[in-house]
Amino acid sequence: MEVVQYIHRLNMTEAGLSGTKALFLRIQKDAIPSVVKFWGINALRLDTNYPIVFEDQASAKKYTMVLRKFSKNAKELRINSIVDYLRDKNIETGDEIIFTRISKISGKYEYYISMKKNLCTQFCYVKPKKLYVILHKEHTSLTSDNGKLVVTSNGKEISLSYEFVGKDTLRDAASKIVGDSTAKALSFNLYKVLLGNDSPNNNMSLKVSNGKYILIEEKRWEISEINN
């Protein structure tokens, strides 16, 4: 028996917190070679919807999801019809969705789905030119609406300018993520110093340890194989 897992960490859009109503999981083109191996089909040539039935490992409830190629040029895959699962599980930004495929001796596949809650102290997400951080009020020592914050990234301390974000959409997202209506969204203007590229596919988590802010980059997806 062969067990293969595809682990996908949710960003703002996928968790339904970015203002969009279309809930789906986007699989970036750089992940496609591994995803082809996981789904067991030639996804690069997928021209129609490919339905797959997943059984929730916690409740045994079955969910039918659809793998679909969204753009031939971008070679982007989407997992559609996942909204029921996301809502049933009260999914939040940073949570992990774990898709598991089990190969039977008969050659058939069985698919399962499960989730793992995000236990990060803070959560970051990226938009063009900005790095936004959702802050728990009890974990921030920032007393002014703008200033400097020393952040540790890859073992290096970097002083960054910050400001609190006043947009209603970001304030709403902050309150949903941490469950606190007084939560604030913080923005850094110099995220390139930390990330080094314009369109990172990974999630960022800002953790607090002994009063220090530590920025950790986490992969948005990964494939793992367990052969029995």
What do the predicted segments below correspond to?
Residues M1-N228:
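Acidic, low-complexity intrinsically disordered regions
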